[in-house]
Amino acid sequence: GGQTVSSTRIRAALEEGRLDDANAMLGTPYAIDWPVVHGKGIGSGKLGTPTLNQNYPAAALQPCAGVYLTRIYLDGRWRPAATGIGKRPTVDSSENAAVTCETFVPDFSGNVYGQQPVLEFHKYFCPVRKFNSMDELAALIHHAADESKAYFAALNGAK
């Protein structure tokens, strides 16, 4: 408390994984609205957890790699979601693997390619790590999505 809010402090908070601090300084959740692009089809294929992929523009601030409890505005309403940011060590362990932003939206199956839905980051959930199997990765994604549903249900109940 008592420190001046600055873009430098907000950027540092996001990069260091202090999402609560960044959101407090912003006065609203950190959010992106980049176009949904085609991924590699791994989520909808091997994992059974189709994800919305949004590429970070080269100069854009990237929050600390990890899994986040998020909500996304699709088809006229906010939906709880789980978003992973970072390299995907379970899928691609190469040194030059791309940083991705992938969001799993439970109970949603619309085609949103090319759209720019607003994605709000509410809570840091856990770090990105390599799993021994795709089943373990899918279990984490579903667990994070369940936590997101519970988080937003509690938040909405508090209003």
Show the residue positions of the predicted features.
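Phosphate/ribose-recognition catalytic cores of enzymes acting on nucleotide-derived substrates
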Residues: 1, 39-159
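Anionic-ligand-binding alpha/beta catalytic cores of soluble enzymes and soluble regulatory domains
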Residues: 3-52
